[in-house]
Amino acid sequence: MTDSDVFKSRKNNNVYHVYDDRIVVHSSSVTKEIPLPVDPDRFMYYLSFDYMFYSGEKLFAVVHTMGLYDKRFEVDEETLELIGPPISTM
């Protein structure tokens, strides 16, 4: 395993380890990997995860792209999945 950035949840006891190609989530009951997203239309190429942050009560993961702007995905802290369409970061 390579070095990762560590991010702790505000809502529960989840700890997120951010790697280039995945986010590994550790909670009291489960360890789960969230893989780097893939665009089924191949319009956008996602290169790597960068960091995580809160905006209000929502948790986001930022992904580097080959486009002009990186994208952010909302993270569902209950299902431990990326949800919704990606949002451009400017």
Q: What function would you assign to each model-found segment?
A:
Residues 1-2, 22-42, 70-88:
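Surface-exposed loop/turn elements that mediate protein-protein interactions on large endomembrane-trafficking
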Residues 1-13, 38-56, 85-90:
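Repeated scaffold domains used in trafficking and secretory/extracellular systems
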Residues 5-19, 24, 55-67:
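Short beta-strand elements that form the blades of beta-propeller/WD-repeat-like
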Residues 16-18, 52, 73-75:
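Assembly/interface hotspot detector across virion components, adhesins/toxins, and nucleic-acid enzymes
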Residues 29, 34, 42-71:
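Acidic, low-complexity, intrinsically disordered interaction modules
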